[in-house]
Structure formats: structure tokens, C-alpha cells
Amino acid sequence: MARKTPLHMVRNIGIAAHIDAGKTTTSERILFFTGISHKIGETHEGTATMDWMDQEKERGITITSAATTCFWRDHQINLIDTPGHVDFTIEVERSMRVLDGAVAVFCSVGGVQPQSETVWRQANKYHVPRIAFVNKMDRVGANFYNVEKQIKDRLKANPVPLQIPIGAEDNFKGVVDLIQMKALVWESDEPTNYVVKDIPADLQDKAKEYHDKLVEAVAETDEKLMEKFFDGVELSIDEIKKGIKTATLSLNIVPMLCGTAFKNKGVQPLLDAVVDYLPAPDEVPNIKGQYENGKEVSVESTDDGEFAALGFKIATDPFVGQLTFVRVYRGVLASGSYVYNAGKGKKERVGRILRMHSNKREEIKELYAGEIGAVVGLKDTLTGDTLASEKDPVILERMEFPDPVISVAVEPKTKADQEKMGIALQKLAQEDPSFRVATDEESGQTIISGMGELHLEIIVDRMLREFKVEAEVGKPQVAYRETIRKTVEQEYKYAKQSGGRGQYGHVFLRLEPMEPGGENYEFVNDIKGGAVPKEYIPAVDKGCQEAMQSGVLAGYPVVDIKVTLFDGSYHEVDSSEMAFKLAASMGFKEGARKANAVILEPMMKVEVETPEEYMGDVIGDLNKRRGQVNNMSDRGGNKIIDAFCPLAEMFGYSTDLRSQTQGRATYSMEFDHYDEVPRNVSEEIIKKRNG
């Protein structure tokens, strides 16, 4: 079967936004207008097609990125839904990897919010071209021009409106198309087509001003157009459109559109913009890959050539079991064929291939380069794994996933559920690389770790819904770390003589603090003249790493240390790897005790938005939680407080904030960095840990 949609007519796009900007509604309307979902699902009634997990229906926030295919003007649009809640940043990061372009949705009232900044940074990191859609133009306080200014000031981007709104709030009727210089008017709130009219008299000056800005922004991308512009020659519609696309793909501009998805206004022009200005898979830089031996290679988007794809999401589907969402970068994936998991060195058989239309599924025989689908039947493939052909086992860029910052102990309500809980947690950990499961060696408890309270709540919730396991959850535990503050040198001799062959290892170690944020550990071999034979050096390194797993103060993992082995001695008969490993491990612990060891705690970046009258209470409360306020600003009549707060003090914050502000304040919180714990707090932590 040949491909139905040529590569240049494929668009892989994500819709990224902050919670409540109306992302799900926008996705819904896109699916509606492209003719897939006939009844429009509303998020507030809990029936949106994109939000297909039960909890999303209850919480009204989008958690898992479902990939959905729809068609507009004969183009195939693969829509990847990205979550907007900060505990799920990992999901956003994961979907950014496989997108070619994005639609950033902003609320016309709320504008650029902290989560928008996080998502924007991720899109910059992966060089994703984007267009902005200012949604909810029908709401009280809607202001398109404010959002334009915030995109400039806060996101440091270059927004270029392709439309300006006609009216706002209840009087929002449509938009002025600044390319064709016509008014597009929707005459009712029902999902209908717009009517093209002349620009209303009171908007003609503003439209002219913004049209000129648009043309100038476009002209800057091309010398020929620049000459025309300076000679006062009008650019043709085609020239303007081509210029917008060039400038969008080079990330020089962010085209801005507006509308209200809820009232069905502005969605068709948004779809046109996706087709006209966002890139096809062959218009973005080739993805890089490498081979086992480290040799780099560029993987071109084409149906010819050996198969290469990235598994970017694992989901458990109640009907077909485990689904692996893949994006094909090169070649063709056929159902029933074998693929090679290059990173793991394993062959896997592809069962069925499904194309998802929200929550309906269509079985297809093949997926071509640039396309996205879900594969049934892969056993060993995890998020971020490359699938390739055995002839050309390329590994595409790995995704990097952050370490969890919060843990809780979970126990099944009944003994009978113990095994079921183990299976459930293992499956959930396969789906989500930022979620970890471990067993506490001392207590035997099962410990789950993740990126925030909401993240873990949802995991426990899913265990109950999908796997019917009821779990008791312990108090949240913070992922503390330990490090040292001064450089020390430490000698350690491990010598045991117990009849027959003895044990002998002797090392001199230098422990130095390293700058945080880089590698956690560095080992330097500085042995001169064979004082410690070469074959024992790796054992010394290993001994230090083992000692770092449990620090000297309270047994937390040790970070940011450089260890240099600079001298030692050995015994012809009694020395062994074991002896040197033990000498290094014990020497490391003794050295760490003298090196001003301190405890580090995760600091969260907290942003609170509150009505002014509660500002004093909110700041007072943050100070009580050992927070440091960095900045205060205004947004839409409210006060914004930016602060760093220790995660340990932030449990249950949402409830406290609600009661302080009568439910009128909102906040967002994400992990930022590790910082030293004050002495009095550190003493308490040590006392608690060492009982």
C-alpha cells in the first residue's frame, strides 16, 4: 500500500498551554471542524474526546498525551495533546521531542502564566516553531493586546499578529484577517463557517497599523522582499504567506491568532495557519542519531531507507493491552514485521498498528516516515527507546528525565493485593519515566517517587481505577541529599590477617566539593609510579560510589563530590579488588565526616497569584515555611509573588492557601534546585533518621 498523504502534507503538532487556557476545548474543536467528532465534548461536563483517562474527566486537566489524527485541506494533522499541569512537565518534554510544530494557547484574560513559561522553554530547547492562539476572547477582561505584550516581555519572543479581534467579551464577533485585509465574522455561537466582510470603519486604522507591522516582519526575512517594502511596493498575499512561514520556521516570529474555541469562533483560520505556517516533517532539521560505537549520524525524513522510529509514550489500553506510541522518522513500519530495539539489542514483533482518533481507533497496515501511530505487541520498549532495523541499528537522541523529588510509602489495604500492587506499579513505571518504584531495605515498605504531590496522587488513583488495588499512602518524604563543604585528604588502610591469605588495601583520597548542577561525582586517578596497581583502580572508584549511596549524616545519597586517588600501597599476595573497594569505601566515609558534611533539600519555585488584600497573609505564610520571596508583580488586577520554598514545608499548601484567601488565590510549584538545609532543621532531620 502506498502512502495516502505525501510527506509535505503531514503536520505533527502539539497544543501546549497552561491549565485553563482552554487547550482541551481547542483540541476538541479542531477535531470537530476536521470532521471526526460529531458532538462537541465540553471539558466542564467531562466528555472531551482528548481527555480519555477517567481522572482527567474528574479533574478537568489533561494528563496523558494522546496522539490523534485528523485531516484539513487534504493535509494529515497528527495532534499530540500535551498536559498543562506542572507535575507533568515530563509528558510535555516527551511530546516536544516528536512534534514538528506547536500551537501555544493563551487565555485572553490570564495571558502568559508560569506554566506557559515552562512549556515555552521546552519548545525553545527542542527548536519547535509555534503559532500563538489567544483563546477565550469572549470572557470578561479579554485583552488580545495585553497578551501580545506579555509574550514579548515574559517569553522574550517576537509575536506578530495575523489577525486582530473585532470586539471583545460579549461583543466578540470575529477577526480582521491582516493578510487579506478582510473581516471574518461568525454570525452565531453555533459551529458554523465565517462570513467574509469589509473591515468595520472603527478598526480600519488599527488594521492598517498591524498590517504594516506584519509586512515589515515578513520583509525582514528576505532581501528581495525588503527591497520591495522599502520601495513602497505592496507584497502579494503569496509573498506574505511564504515570508510568514520562513520566519516561523526559523523561530524569528510567532504568528498570533485569536478566537474563542468554546463559542466556535476562530478555529478554522487556526487550522489554516497550522497547514500554512507550521512545518512538514521534511521542513525541520533531521533528527540526530548515533551508533553503539558513538559515531553520529543524521536521520533523514524519507520513506526510503532503513526503518527508524522513536517510542515516545507507553499507555495501557483496557481493550488491547499495552500501546506504544511511535513516531516514524525514516522508512516504513509494517504490522506483523520485526523491529530491532537498538538501545537494548532486542528484536520485537509488531502486532497491530492503530491510528488513534481521540478515543476511537482505526487499524492500519503501515506507518510511513513522519507519521505517528500506536503499536500493539511490543514487550521491552520503554519511553525514549529507538526502534530500528537490524541492518542499521541507529539510536535516536535519548530523552533526559529528571530525578523525582518526593516519595511516599504505599501499602496495599489487604495482604491479597500485595502482588497485584507490585504488577500495577511496575506497569505505571513503564509508562512514566519520571515515576520510580523501590523497596526500602530497612522497613521492607514499597516506596514510590515522583515529581510532585499531584503526580503521586494520580498514580495511587490509577492503581485503584485501572488495577483495582486499594492502597494506604504514608506521609510524603522529601528526597534529601548530602554533600561536603571543604576539601579533605584521608588515608585509609584496610588490612585483615585471619590465617592463610589476608586482605590488604591502602589508599590516600582527596575529597573536594564540586559545583552543583553538573555531574554528581567525578573520580580522578592521580597515582604515580604504580603505588596502587592499575587493576585495582576501578575497585577504588566503585568503593567510593558505593559509599556515596548513603551519606554520613543521615544516610541520604551524597552528591557533588570529586574524589582523587593520589597515593597508596599494596601487598603482592594479600591485595585484592575487594580489599581496595573496602579501603576506598571506609576511607571515603571517614573523610566525609571531616569535610563539613551538610544536608541539601529540594527547593521549589513557587508562584502565587492572589488578590491584593491577601498579599500580606500569603507572604507571611511563605516566610513561615522558610520561603524566600524573590519578586512581586501585577497581573490582571492580582498580585504575583515569586518565591523559592523548601519542598518539605510545602505539603498540603493548596489547602492552606485556599483557606487563607477564601479560595481566590492560585499557585504553581515546580522543582528548581537543591540548597543547604539550615542547621536547626538539619539536626532534626538527622535525629529523625537515626532514631
Swiss-Prot record:
All residue ranges annotated as the tr-type G domain in the record: 8-282
One of the protein's GO biological processes: ribosome disassembly
Location in or out of the cell: Cytoplasm
InterPro entries, sorted: EFG_II (IPR041095), EFG_III (IPR009022), EFG_III/V (IPR035647), EFG_IV (IPR047872), EFG_V (IPR035649), EFG_V-like (IPR000640), EFTu-like_2 (IPR004161), G_TR_CS (IPR031157)
GO CC annotation: cytoplasm
GO molecular function, one term: translation elongation factor activity
Entry keyword annotation includes Protein biosynthesis: yes
Function per UniProt: Catalyzes the GTP-dependent ribosomal translocation step during translation elongation. During this step, the ribosome changes from the pre-translocational (PRE) to the post-translocational (POST) state as the newly formed A-site-bound peptidyl-tRNA and P-site-bound deacylated tRNA move to the P and E sites, respectively. Catalyzes the coordinated movement of the two tRNA molecules, the mRNA and conformational changes in the ribosome.
Protein name (Swiss-Prot/TrEMBL): Elongation factor G
Organism annotation: Campylobacter hominis (strain ATCC BAA-381 / DSM 21671 / CCUG 45161 / LMG 19568 / NCTC 13146 / CH001A)
Gene: fusA
